[in-house]
UniProtKB/Swiss-Prot annotation:
Tagged with keyword Hydrolase: yes
Gene that this polypeptide is encoded by: smp
Annotated spans, Disordered: 41-86, 144-164, 303-325
Protein name, as recorded: Extracellular minor metalloprotease
Temperature sensitivity of activity: Optimum temperature is 50 degrees Celsius.
Location (main, coarse): secreted
Gene Ontology molecular function: any one: metalloendopeptidase activity
UniProt pH dependence: Optimum pH is 8.0.
EC number(s) recorded for this UniProt protein: 3.4.24.-
Composition bias, Basic and acidic residues: 48-57, 304-325
Amino acid sequence: MPAQRMRSVIPPYMLRALLTRYAPQRDCALHTLNHVQSLLGNKPLRSPTEKNARAGERSAISTTPERHPTARQTGAQGGAAQQPRRAVDEAYDHLGVTYDFFWQAYRRNSVDNKGLPLVQRALRQGLPEQLSGTASRWCSETATARSSTVSPSPSTLVGHELTHGSDRERSRLIYYQQSGALNESLSDVFGSLVKQFHLQQTADKADWLIGAGLLAKGIKGKGLRSMSAPGTAYDDPLLGKDPQPASMKDYIQTKEDNGGVHLNSGIPNRAFYLAATVLGGFAGKKPVTSGMTRCATKRCRKTPTSDHLRPRHGETRAGLRTKRGDKVQQAWASGWQWSNETAADAQSGYGH
């Protein structure tokens, strides 16, 4: 299973729900689902400016999905945005927030610590209206730290997609089954941390939502995913109910979505949320975040098909070095909630 894949922040199961529940948007949902699936099978495009990057370099681009992302550049590079279009301006601003977060929190020069240019495309072709009131589409090209959107562009999603670029260069987690779910969780974690950094929120004040505000008006939901309570992000007749499990005892075995990478990412997401709130303060600077990062950069580099047990133990050890180590360990344990049957099933065929 190749490690370098394009990602889509909109999980395929949401698009499939629209295909079966909402006839007026069926064609749009099918077109988008086919596009997402084609991205999962393609190699990412390389950035023409990647080799000559300046610190903090970023660009926002307006284009169509069929064209090369640099075909029409309407945002500025390295300075103030010059294009008044809201979509491009917001995209450009969020790239700056993401760069500032990685620099101020971890002293990393861009997501790869090598000054990788941050490129974002504003695509003029939409998702079904139930997924966005402004008909936006999200995808990413992780080799060059690229992501795509049309306004609004929540900072969690920008941080999420750009982190995939860091995942590829640092952890090389296989985008499949448990290691793929961990890959998605790492991006959700840092996407949420970028938002918390931007809003200056402590762990107890953050909403821990991925894609808050992305759902259209009238849809019963808060966002695409909830890190604090997986499975509760939305419950709507058109989208169905958020299917994410919150613990390993509810782990989902499936061949869809690269083995359920967007589904089972809710498990490490909730464990991280519980540990971060126990530690308190700004989650981006806490030992639990460092533990998760170390897992991605060192332990998981050696085992790119890593199962969930490895990051769990690694992050627990990081928490034990704090004054609240016992409480952090308890938080992780309550987040994972293994059952004997699920443990045997989930570990078969993975990891080693």
